[in-house]
Amino acid sequence: MPKKCRHLLQTSDLSLDEIKLLLKKASVYANDFNAVSLETKEKMQNKIIVALFFENSTRTVSSFEIASLRLGAKIVKLNMQTSSASKGETLTDTFKNIYAMQPDAIITRHAFSSAPFKLAEFSQCPLINAGSGVSAHPTQALLDLLTLYQHFGSLENLKGKKIAFIGDVKNSRVANSNIKLLQRLGLEIMLCAPSSMLPSVSLKTTHNIEEAIEFADILMSLRTQTERHNAPIFASLKDYGNAYCITQKRLEAHAKNKEIIILHPGPVHRDIDIESAVLEDKRSKVLEQVKNGVAMRMAVLEFLLLD
């Protein structure tokens, strides 16, 4: 019987102590990507990781590649547009064939929310969910938490802080994973979106971005996921931006007397999700999130493959 391995399919797969461990390790790597011990590099140098992405990605796939290489592992990224999946091979058969080659870990992204949970049934190597439908994106939530942890100084300081998610919350796996994780850590949450972009949850909601800004210590803007909409919700993205863009004017009017930070998981629609001037503002932590993506994914890979 092979040794049972750990998967990371959703943030609830991790205990609070394990989350603290990941934050500690990722903080070291965020300060210095080269702070990988010789012991870790020696153990990782023969590890082979496969990235199996059935949806497009820039930040996630690149940061997993860089994280793997910085740890000393080898990574194979499959181009699913030129794979046998384009010839009609099923997801399960594609996965089983890759798994038969005995990689040490598989990172997967798929449009179906259930995909990683189904694939985990066939895997005795660590499986990492890099985004599944609208349900989960655990490493994004962890890197966002790392960004908040760095800014506020500790998990204890995060308790009671208020975060507003602004945008297409209903179709955002990032929001879904973040909400579940941040609720565990004692943050207050508000969702801000038009009715058609709000999920059915027992959380504070508003259709008014000004109310969200006044409520929050942290704003997380989300892009409109038009690829998941059955019909247009606004006449144009510009019309959406007029109602929900985080602008200097709105921040000046509704967050003038408090410290507030702004996050976005990317890709950002400039001047639709967040005004360009705000993205360049010191309150924007968007590029810190990107950097922290490498650090946190280094910590996750080390945790799953070596611990």
From Swiss-Prot:
Pfam family, one: OTCace_N
Binding residue positions for carbamoyl phosphate: R59, T60, R109, H137, Q140, G266, P267
GO molecular function: amino acid binding; aspartate carbamoyltransferase activity
Keyword terms of this UniProt record: Pyrimidine biosynthesis, Transferase
Gene Ontology biological process terms, A to Z: 'de novo' pyrimidine nucleobase biosynthetic process; 'de novo' UMP biosynthetic process; amino acid metabolic process
Annotated residues for binding of L-aspartate: K87, R173, R223
Pathway: Pyrimidine metabolism; UMP biosynthesis via de novo pathway; (S)-dihydroorotate from bicarbonate: step 2/3
Catalytic reaction list: carbamoyl phosphate + L-aspartate = N-carbamoyl-L-aspartate + phosphate + H(+)
Gene Ontology cellular-component annotations: cytosol
EC number, UniProt record: 2.1.3.2
Function summary: Catalyzes the condensation of carbamoyl phosphate and aspartate to form carbamoyl aspartate and inorganic phosphate, the committed step in the de novo pyrimidine nucleotide biosynthesis pathway.
Quaternary context: Heterododecamer (2C3:3R2) of six catalytic PyrB chains organized as two trimers (C3), and six regulatory PyrI chains organized as three dimers (R2).
NCBIfam families: asp_carb_tr, PRK00856.1
Similarity-based family: Belongs to the aspartate/ornithine carbamoyltransferase superfamily. ATCase family.
Protein name, entry field: Aspartate carbamoyltransferase catalytic subunit
